[in-house]
Amino acid sequence: MEHHAVEFTAQHLIALLPLLVTCMSAIVVMLAIAARRNHALTFVLTVLGLNLALLSLLPAMGVAPLEVTALLQIDRFAGYYMALVLAASLACVTLTHAYLGGQSGKGYPGNREELYLLILLSAAGGLVLASAQHLVGLFIGLELLSVPTYGMIAYAFFNKRSLEAGIKYMVLSAAGSAFLLFGMALLYAEAGDMGFRAIGASLAQGSSLLVELGIGMMLIGLAFKLSLVPFHLWTPDVYEGAPAPVAAFLATASKVAVFAVLLRLYQISPATAGGWLNELLTLIAIASILFGNLLALLQNNLKRLLGYSSIAHFGYLLVALIASQGLAVEAIGVYLATYVLTSLGAFGVITLMSTPYSGRDADALYEYRGLFWRRPYLTAVLTVMMLSLAGIPLTAGFIGKFYVIAAGVEAQLWWLLGAMVLGSAIGVFYYLRVMVTLFMREPNLHRHDAPFDWGQRAGGIMLLVVALLAFFLGVYPQPLLELVHNAALVALAQ
């Protein structure tokens, strides 16, 4: 790869628009906070910024595919995952607004505005990750994504659990990043270049132990961020301690971005999957599927349950990653989209049920007993989400799972498929358990509840939209499939 001076033209700027708009929004929000604290204004600015960033994807895709410096590759693949990250962030922002008080008038003790700023910064990191094609781009994106999340997790600092979760995540995340960097150093020592493509080329000539170790260590760093099995221990604690909208962000936007970059690495340099690394990934996938589902059986806390189930879901995604032929890239795109939808819905219901003033979120299962008799529509939303996570037909989750299984069959990964089917069967059980709880006749206990008019607020409207989408995509998935097909073709064509 000959190094030439980077010409930076208007086209490059257009290609970078989503990222630039997101960063500009962060700056605007920061200045607005500095000028005058106003929760509603901050919320509106953030939503505007994220919507503009989503819209700016259109002109950006117009000039794609385009290599912007050696670090970023803006193409349809990047565009698709950028859209997912931005949409997830947008949903988390509306949830944050509902969570931090909205119109309920009860003031959140402390400053509310910075949370929006952190979400914007983190989203910018996600955008960098989705388009990274270089180890440095990957690392910058990863840090920009995860550093603001430390603050977000500990945002309800007057709540001991939240603070503990933030510190725990920060320490473990640093360890994960250290592994990642070490792996990168080993790769660079061997390949002499940090671009994914160059690494792939030098790997194709023959793999040495150094390279395999380097990739293995990088995988450890990324597996930590995706909470795959041996590195999953932080997940339930952090999900439980973090404020509900932040848990939603962690489960959706941050994981999608990391998975996108992992997929890109695998697509561009297939040699990274060679040898014992493939077996290692297979083991991690099987372990994630089984552990995630089995540990979720024991949970009496909805957020912890969702944490464990997200471990299992990323185990399923690894199956498609290992298959990484034909269908697999599309399968991953579809699965991530449906997973984001359903996770946002599930965490959204928890968000609307909780207020940060009552000391902790409404995440214990008993708080949802008989919810149907008090908030029927909210219950309907949560029920659809649980069905979708379990992968029941007529919901979006089924389409994703179906595609992943199809990809696995295509690549003939029978062991992995066995684990998937077993895991899904266990999964149905604990999702049903949540649903049964919702419809129980309840003893009259006083506890916190979603406000009566939740459906007329930003957060509630977003939830209803998500529920309808989850159902609609389950019945008529064609639009999503076409989108993903376009994005996947580009990834394979390179």
Curated annotation (Swiss-Prot):
Keywords: Cell inner membrane, Cell membrane, Membrane, NAD, Quinone, Translocase, Transmembrane, Transmembrane helix, Transport, Ubiquinone. It is found in: Cell inner membrane. GO terms for cellular component: plasma membrane. It comes from the Bacteria. GO terms for molecular function: NADH dehydrogenase (ubiquinone) activity; NADH:ubiquinone reductase (non-electrogenic) activity; quinone binding. Its main location: membrane. It is a multi-pass membrane protein. InterPro entries: NADH-Q_OxRdtase_suN/2 (IPR010096), ND/Mrp_TM (IPR001750). Its EC number is 7.1.1.-. GO terms for biological process: ATP synthesis coupled electron transport. The chain crosses the membrane at residues 13-33, 43-63, 82-102, 117-137, 138-158, 169-189, 209-229, 243-263, 277-297, 311-331, 332-352, 380-400, 412-432, 461-481. It catalyses: a quinone + NADH + 5 H(+)(in) = a quinol + NAD(+) + 4 H(+)(out). NDH-1 shuttles electrons from NADH, via FMN and iron-sulfur (Fe-S) centers, to quinones in the respiratory chain. The immediate electron acceptor for the enzyme in this species is believed to be ubiquinone. Couples the redox reaction to proton translocation (for every two electrons transferred, four hydrogen ions are translocated across the cytoplasmic membrane), and thus conserves the redox energy in a proton gradient. Belongs to the complex I subunit 2 family. NDH-1 is composed of 13 different subunits. Subunits NuoA, H, J, K, L, M, N constitute the membrane sector of the complex. NCBIfam families: NDH_I_N, PRK05777.1-1. This is NADH-quinone oxidoreductase subunit N. It comes from Ectopseudomonas mendocina (strain ymp) (Pseudomonas mendocina). The gene is nuoN.
